[in-house]
Amino acid sequence: MSVPDLLRGLLGLVGILAIAFAFSSHRTRINWRTVGFGLALQLVFAVFILKGEDMATVFAPLGWPKAAFAFVAGLFVDFLAAVEVGSAFIFGNLGLGPASEGSLGFFFFSQVLPTVVVFAALMSILYYLGVMQVVVRGMAWVVRRALGTSGPESLSVSANIFVGQTEAPLVIKPYVEKLTRSELMAVMTGGMATIAGGVLASYVAFLGERYAQATGVAVEVGQQLFAEQLLGASVMAAPAALILAKILIPETEDVPDVDARFTTDANEATLPSTASDEATAGVNAAVIDDGPKNVIDAAASGAADGMKLALNIGAMLIAFLALIAIINGSLGWAVELFGVTLPEGKGALDLALGFVLAPVAWLVGVPMADITTFGGFLGTKVIANEFVAYTLLADAIAAGSIQPKTITIATFALCGFANLSSIGIQIGGIGPLAPSRTGEIAALGVRAVLAGTLANLMTATIAGVLLG
């Protein structure tokens, strides 16, 4: 970590906070304690997660968090190997990764999408057993005590580390209708700044494959690398989301000191959508649902949900990549009428987004040679979604056309659902929990996308300094 990199990282953090401050709805009501402690918590997470080996040289126990994190990342790699067994049974050799004997190469539909199905089944089992509830509550306790945020918003944002933007608010179902505008913004931003576990596993799968292909390392090594980085990005995004939400929409109302909790009836731990949430604002509101009856039922229902998500991802990628190709072709034809020749392999839309967002890329520490390429990734993420952007990143990794530092920063910066289509997803997902506030959710949508994007850029800036 050089002094110039450190200074540029500090400039990036200041720039991100300045952008948020410029768009704040009540600049005089910003709680700078929350911002300061949130940034400190994010830095603590980053140092222990990303630089644990260096910390261990000073005092061995300081390396334990990193070791634990690496262990979890290793479980992801083992999980992907297990997914390959199921994929190969259905798809034959098409389901075998490039590093496996008998593989026919890399096929997205038979090697990546099955990951979503299996991970959804696994998460359903963990919720049924009550494991995830304990983990989420622990994370929420840390976030709430450090930042001074309310129980409901802390719990929802913490849940977003593991589940998607429409599932996480379900753990605070009884509170949603009564959330303040600032709390609602925090809940929405938490969804925008993070990704769901199922798609995270799929990113680990195909980014690791492409990285191994480009560098010659074992596929497991590439997957371990991206598992650690994507898990780190998800954890770091929680305090970052609250920081940016509280700057853009500061708290202006009195918030009761409520510890939000989600519990279950008859000790039946289920997914957040089927758990009973205990309201503590004077009224106990039990939400009772016929959830999974046993582990097998939980696995089956999770797999069914995962299949729907996998099919949705496949359809979305086909549509968006085709539309981007159409736009690139149309714009390319238009500029050629004026005698302009585009660089080989570069689309007009990619170049336009790259140039527009190049200053942002420079601000967060991307090497000068890659700022337009990174800008294209970021623009694609906001206009389309992060899955499309990650496929472009994977192609760039396989081609060896971007520097290692750019790969690291892009991995963190793209790790979130902050895109325009997510506004509609949140209206449809959070709106039914608070029908009277659907209009307010829609009104906050663009700000939530901005906050989520800035949160991802903040984690990317820190990662770029520590890992650059």
Locate each region found by the language model.
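Intrinsically disordered, low-complexity non-transmembrane regions of multi-pass membrane transporters
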Residues: 1, 62, 88-90, 250-306, ...
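Juxtamembrane and boundary regions of transmembrane helices in multi-pass small-molecule transporters
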Residues: 23, 176-177, 201-281, 427-434, ...
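Structural signature of hydrophobic alpha-helical transmembrane segments
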Residues: 2-13, 111, 347-349, 410-419
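Alpha-helical membrane segments and immediately flanking helix-loop junctions
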Residues: 146-204, 291, 295, 375-462
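Interfacial/capping segments of alpha-helical transmembrane domains
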Residues: 36, 47-90, 327-355, 369-377
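Transmembrane helical segments that form the transport core of multi-pass membrane transport proteins
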Residues: 296, 304-398
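Hydrophobic core segments of alpha-helical transmembrane domains in multi-pass membrane transport
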Residues: 12-24, 38-51, 116-125, 193-205, ...
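Hydrophobic alpha-helical hairpins/lids featuring a short glycine-rich hinge
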Residues: 77-147
